[in-house]
Design a protein with these regions (language model features):
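Winged-helix-like regulatory helical subdomains adjacent to P-loop NTPase cores
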Residues: 1-102, 108
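Short, amphipathic alpha-helical interaction segments positioned at domain boundaries
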Residues: 57, 119-134
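Minor-groove-contacting beta-hairpin "wing" of winged helix-turn-helix DNA-binding domains
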Residues: 111-116
Length: 135
């Protein structure tokens, strides 16, 4: 369970805490997960991730605001997610520095990657919605 939670959150404290709370308070005791032990399984964690991705919270709102306020940040994340572009990590690049400071990206063996799967999904869905409204 802990490894799977880490796979989704990369240890981001708010996300870890939120997932654990959702598993404990909303997944456990639900129809598909009647007991607490049922909820602390792969299926229960995935259910909590779905709940988290569908809720509005201050962290996700902050992510969206930063993307809207910093066009270069928007461009970097968009290139990573939709064009599969390899972006070399360079801490002297102001856009990369800002993206890392906000926790959006991290350095993975000299390449920029989105910092965790939950952020990746939130941002992907945001850009997908933007593209739909543009067309």
């Amino acid at each position: 369970s802990a490894n799977l939670i880490y796979d989704y959150t990369a240890g981001y404290p708010f996300l870890v805490s939120k997932l654990c709370k959702l598993i404990d308070e909303r997944v456990a005791g639900s129809k598909n997960f009647p007991e607490k032990t049922d909820a602390w399984t792969k299926a229960g964690i995935i259910e909590a991730v779905k709940l988290l991705l569908n809720e509005k919270n201050t962290l996700f709102e902050s992510l969206v605001n930063k993307i809207q306020d910093y066009p270069q940040l928007h461009e970097i994340i968009y290139e990573l997610l939709f064009n599969g572009k390899t972006i070399l990590y360079n801490s002297l690049n102001p856009s990369i520095e800002a993206a890392e400071m906000f926790g959006f990206i991290k350095n993975n063996d000299g390449q920029v990657i989105v910092s965790n799967r939950i952020f990746e999904t939130v941002l992907y869905n945001l850009f997908l919605a933007e593209d739909i409204f543009k067309s």
